[in-house]
């Protein structure tokens, strides 16, 4: 009539303290989320960085800009956003991508990663292929 009682149930304490999972993201405001989505859609290659391409304000942003330049990214297909100008943007992009650091690179609306990932992809040739597939490189002159 009564089923067997699991020994695990007997050994388990009646009260278990559960810690809620901690997430990097809080609820983004609708306006911030829409602004980030709009920025990501503004060009095939989008970089959220500290400073500007002409005047990067951190070594990682500078290294990422230099790598994109070495890869031959077409300036007409590139957009950069200075997160130092807007605290909501700075925190929002981290939450949006669930990536804790800046710079953050997007190609064709897909999050690629930060400086370390971009550098690794450049070394393996993956970045060149990704940018070529996105048609984001300066076209080669026909001779």
Swiss-Prot record:
Cellular component annotations (GO), alphabetically ordered: mitochondrial matrix
Binding-site residues for glutathione, renumbered to this chain: 50, 90-94, 102, 115-116
Alphabetical list of Pfam families matching this protein: Glutaredoxin (PF00462)
Molecular function in Gene Ontology: 2 iron, 2 sulfur cluster binding; disulfide oxidoreductase activity; metal ion binding
Boundaries of the annotated transit peptide in chain numbering: 1-28
Annotated ranges, domain Glutaredoxin: 33-138
Gene3D superfamilies: Glutaredoxin
Kinase recorded as keyword: no
Keywords: 2Fe-2S, Iron, Iron-sulfur, Metal-binding, Mitochondrion, Redox-active center, Transit peptide
Binding residue positions for [2Fe-2S] cluster: 58
Compartment annotation: Mitochondrion matrix
UniProt function note: Monothiol glutaredoxin involved in mitochondrial iron-sulfur (Fe/S) cluster transfer. Receives iron-sulfur clusters from scaffold protein ISU1 and mediates their transfer to apoproteins, to the 4Fe/FS cluster biosynthesis machinery, or export from mitochondrion.
NCBIfam families: Grx4 family monothiol glutaredoxin (TIGR00365)
Protein family membership: Belongs to the glutaredoxin family. Monothiol subfamily.
Subunit structure and binding partners: Homodimer.
Name under which the protein is recorded: Monothiol glutaredoxin-5, mitochondrial
Native source organism of the sequence: Lachancea kluyveri (Yeast)
Gene that this sequence comes from: GRX5
């Amino acid at each position: 009539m009564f089923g067997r009682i699991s020994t695990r149930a007997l050994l388990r304490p009646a009260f278990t303290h559960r810690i809620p999972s901690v997430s990097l993201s809080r609820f983004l405001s609708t306006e911030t989320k829409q602004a980030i989505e709009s920025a990501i859609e503004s060009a095939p290659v989008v970089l959220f960085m500290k400073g500007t391409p002409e005047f990067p304000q951190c070594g990682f942003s500078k290294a990422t800009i230099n790598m994109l330049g070495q890869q031959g990214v077409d300036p007409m297909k590139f957009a950069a956003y200075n997160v130092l100008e807007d605290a909501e943007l700075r925190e929002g992009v981290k939450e949006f991508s669930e990536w804790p650091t800046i710079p953050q690179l997007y190609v064709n609306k897909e999050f690629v990663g930060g400086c370390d990932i971009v550098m690794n992809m450049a070394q393996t040739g993956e970045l060149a292929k990704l940018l070529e597939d996105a048609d984001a490189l300066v076209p080669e002159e026909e001779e």
